[in-house]
Amino acid sequence: MNWPAIERVESKRVVLDPLTVQHAPEMLPVLADPSIYEFIGGTPPTLEQLHRLYGVQSLGHSDDNAQWWLNWVVCLRRPRRAVGYMQATVERRAGVLEANIAWVISPAFQGRGLATEATASMIVWLTASGVDRYVAYIHPDHAASAAIARKQGLRPTSVVEDGEVRWQNE
């Protein structure tokens, strides 16, 4: 499938900038807080790891073109500052475009509704790009992410993968 190019997405307080390798230095301090990894696993990345990861993620699609990879850096509008990231992996399933979405906001900026605003903006853009179904995998103890998903119209299902509950909009 020929996927459209990722675009910049703007909302009232945040801008979603399409991810590039050049974002790595700016994202390093955003991802440095170990508490980010409490529910998602892993450890804070090094600059070299971010360069490699962003090199792959910014390609925009899988080698076989079956998946559309969308990654944005979430930035405050004023002052312009990176505070997190948004992700969507889109693929066709049973004739429907399904986006597996995820979000991370630096703990220093959590509790302000930024993830909710950024996620809503991403979903509007994805819907305009033809996506029909949204799913997110959320740790059952991660109340903040569950609240964000619920505000986007996602509901928990009985499906559990790797200890995370599948949420979806249908």
PLM regions and their residue ranges:
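Conserved active-site alpha-helix within GNAT-family acetyltransferase domains
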Residues: T116, D141-T157
